[in-house]
Amino acid sequence: MKRVYLDNGSTSFPKAPGVSDAVKNFMDNVGTNVNRGGYEEAYAAEDIIIETREKLCKLFHFDKLRNVIFTPSITYSLNYIIKGYLRPGDHVLVSSMEHNAMMRPLQQVKQLGVEFDRIPCTRDGELMVDKIEEMIRPNTKAIMMLHASNVCGTVMPLQEVGDICHKHNLKFIVDAAQTAGSFPINIEQMHIDVLAFTGHKSLLGPQGIGGFLVSDEVAHEMIPLVTGGTGSVSDSEFQPEFMPDKFESGTQNIPGIYGLRAALCYLEETGIENIHAHEMELCKAFIEKID
């Protein structure tokens, strides 16, 4: 019997061609750390990490290579952003469709004095964009929202919300867990200040690798939640302030980054627009068949 996998909202399967080979190649033939040694294999692994950052910049139309931060998952990314950027007295707006990766950290910082309000949605799950401006307060710092819901499939109008953020000088923080790799996302055009992603869903990479792309202004204000060894300025006991070291302490998931790079190569070759069109065709066919 042929297996039909329908759980891609949780994690993609199968992964992109070449992903498992890339992970295995690192584990079997490379196996080094980065920024900790001055020999050929370590430099080669560092080159792969840099190339992966470059591919993420290209995919999301972002021009700050050093501001691409790797984390273990998008949940970690959102925790870093929410707990590192928001301060007591700040107010943020979120949609009423948010995942717990957003809401649980927000509920934690609420206990410390951060406030948030939920932008309502219609009964069909569409964001009520016309309500946003009347909800903005003098202390509103950002609008934070997912791009798409893995519960009902709602896709948020990022361009419209980004335009409102730009108009009111608010930061725009986007959870792209469900859409990075299957929807075109343009950070510059959409006025996105922070884009959080995971590697194992529509990016078609392995589990255990995620990250975020962050503007200089937000990165400067953020406090690193995890500090430690970075392989840089090791004679100092204080965390580096330069990027990406400010937010990348400890050993990276280098096998995961190797796998993610392979997935990004596949996405480049196939084209995000082609992938998106194919997914929309599949969605239409599914709806027609069950109607």
Predicted regions and their residues:
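Pyridoxal 5′-phosphate
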Residues: 1-291
